[in-house]
A protein has these predicted regions:
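Short, glycine-/small-residue-rich phosphate/pyrophosphate-handling segment
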Residues: 94-151
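N-terminal beta1-alpha1-beta2 submodule of the flavodoxin-like/Rossmannoid cofactor-binding fold
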Residues: 1-91, 171-172, 177-180, 197-214
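Amphipathic alpha-helical segments that form well-ordered structural scaffolds
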Residues: 24, 28, 115, 119-122, ...
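Well-ordered, non-membrane alpha-helical segments in soluble/globular domains
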Residues: 73-81, 110-114, 152-159
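Glycine-rich phosphate/pyrophosphate-binding loop and the adjoining helix
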Residues: 29, 131-214
């Protein structure tokens, strides 16, 4: 039995994009994988949870991208976890990362993945590889059956590679991806339309979207 701890770095405690990608990754995972899930906000409130994490064989850190890095709560977690690792004996845990961003291009996540790799090197953890998911807002809202959509082929192929690595201990280079069969301009257009749709749903008037607060 392989013990896998999953750290959700989203500031949200539910319905985040990170939640979605974790669910899609683990839904078809082998029964030989024992999974424990943690939220960084909960860990920072109860640091005894860190003991359960270092008892794992593998660790996955899933987080949104905030300006080439991570949310402040995730950065704080890395700081606290790093200190905990220095003070406690731990096995050679293998680490993966899954970072999603609102930008269309998956390459925007490259720096964040490098941060996790450097964290591993500094704290005697084994870095495996990570997924950098562009268009992160698109995938959770794309369909009730997103795995069948042509735009999502790269995502589900990459999730499969990550799943197989966790199950079979294979290694790969970082995978940077974005929606298939979609241009960046179409992505931006659909994202902007989302604001208008949200405005209608909340009975706000469209002109209010263009108002300035200064």
């Amino acid at each position: 039995m392989i013990k896998l701890s999953i750290i959700n770095g989203s500031p949200k405690l539910k319905n985040s994009n990170s939640d979605f990608f974790i669910k899609e990754l683990t839904s078809n995972m082998s029964s030989d994988i024992s999974i424990k899930k943690f939220y960084v906000r909960e860990i920072l409130k109860d640091k005894t949870l860190l003991k359960g994490i270092i008892e794992s064989d593998k660790l996955l850190i899933a987080s949104p991208l905030y300006a080439d890095s991570f949310p402040s709560v995730t950065l704080k977690f890395l700081e606290v976890f790093g200190e905990f690792l220095k003070e406690n004996n731990h096995p050679q845990i293998e680490v993966y990362a899954m970072v999603n961003c609102g930008f269309f291009e998956g390459k925007q996540n490259k720096t964040a993945l490098n941060i996790i790799e450097h964290f591993c090197n500094r704290n005697n953890l084994t870095w495996k590889f990570g997924l950098g998911i562009g268009g992160g807002e698109f995938f959770p809202n794309s369909s009730k059956t997103p795995e069948t959509m042509a735009t999502n082929k790269s995502l589900y192929s990459s999730l499969k590679s990550l799943r197989e690595s966790i199950e079979n201990n294979t290694s790969k280079e970082n995978i940077l991806l974005n929606p298939d069969k979609m241009s960046a301009s179409i992505y931006r257009l659909s994202a902007n339309m989302g604001w208008y749709i949200s405005s209608f749903n909340k009975t706000h008037k469209i002109p209010n979207l263009r108002k300035k607060i200064y």
